[in-house]
């Protein structure tokens, strides 16, 4: 369960990074 939660958090962070990068461009 802990591993799945970490993966979900990583995916959420990556999604935020992608949206942030697209906004700065």
From Swiss-Prot:
Main location: periplasm
Keyword Nuclease: no
Statement: the UniProt record of this protein carries the keyword Amino-acid biosynthesis: no
Keywords in alphabetical order: Bacterial flagellum, Periplasm
A cellular component annotation (GO) from this entry: periplasmic flagellum
Cell location: Periplasmic flagellum; Periplasm
Function: Component of the core of the flagella.
Subunit structure: The flagellum consists of an outer layer composed of two sheath proteins, flaA1 (44 kDa) and flaA2 (35 kDa) around a core that contains three proteins flaB1 (37 kDa), flaB2 (34 kDa) and flaB3 (32 kDa).
Similarity section: Belongs to the bacterial flagellin family.
Name of the protein: Flagellar filament core protein flaB3
Species of provenance: Brachyspira hyodysenteriae
């Amino acid at each position: 369960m802990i591993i799945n939660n970490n993966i979900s958090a990583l995916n959420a962070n990556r999604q935020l990074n992608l949206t942030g990068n697209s906004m700065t461009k």
